[in-house]
Regions:
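Loop-rich catalytic cores of soluble enzymes, especially ATP-dependent carboxylate-amine ligases
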Residues: 74, 104-192
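Terminal catalytic/cofactor-binding subdomain
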Residues: 1-95
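An acidic/histidine-cluster motif and surrounding catalytic segment
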Residues: 99
Length: 192
């Protein structure tokens, strides 16, 4: 892939926000605009890869990575994760898509978090694309979930009725030393 790395921006068109290695952030007003933009990016990627004899494959885990060989992404946040969770941070070589939804109020964000939480099993079924772990078929359609579920603050958001309850719960997690920031919450649906 080194030859691809050298020429990847030559044909890619206008730049997008790239917050880190392997991450792409796109902000659009409507779902239709986001779908059109992602479709165009997918087509551009496919064309560029074909010119360079590279295949494209999607998934939620790397199909044959070996976690002891993973490097921790440079930066305080990931170094802290590694110090706190050790090998879990290296096993956390997963990727996926997340969506930010704008809300008119903090209480609406909590309501939406709770309302979307009941659909998580359907989201998982629709996105099942990670059957391999360390090069072996896991017999799970979404082994990615197992990597995330190892973290203490993963899974469903606890039942919270409003933003005040969320801030009290989060303050409790901080006081216990479990969470330093909101990004420490690996909930399936998370308010921000």
């Amino acid at each position: 892939l080194s030859r691809f790395r050298e020429s990847r921006y030559t044909h890619a068109g206008p730049p997008h926000h790239l917050p880190g290695r392997g991450a792409l952030h796109i902000s659009r007003e409507t779902v239709e605009e986001a779908c059109a933009d992602l479709g165009g990016l997918r087509d551009t990627l496919r064309q560029h890869c074909e010119r360079n004899n590279i295949g494209v494959c999607g998934g939620g885990t790397h199909p044959f990575h070996h976690w002891p060989e993973r490097r921790i992404c440079p930066g305080d946040r990931f170094n802290d994760l590694y110090q706190r969770y050790g090998y879990l941070a290296k096993q956390f070589t997963v990727f996926g898509q997340h969506v930010h939804v704008g809300c008119t109020s903090a209480d609406e964000a909590i309501w939406l978090t709770q309302a979307l939480g009941v659909y998580v099993p359907a989201f998982i079924a629709l996105s099942a694309s990670s059957p391999f772990v360390d090069g072996v078929d896991s017999f799970y359609q979404s082994a990615r979930l197992n990597a995330v579920s190892a973290f203490p603050l993963s899974g469903q958001c606890p039942p919270l009725g409003n933003w005040q309850e969320f801030t009290e719960h989060f303050a409790f997690l901080q006081a216990c030393g479990i969470a330093q920031g909101i990004k420490d919450l690996y909930w399936d649906v998370r308010p921000k």
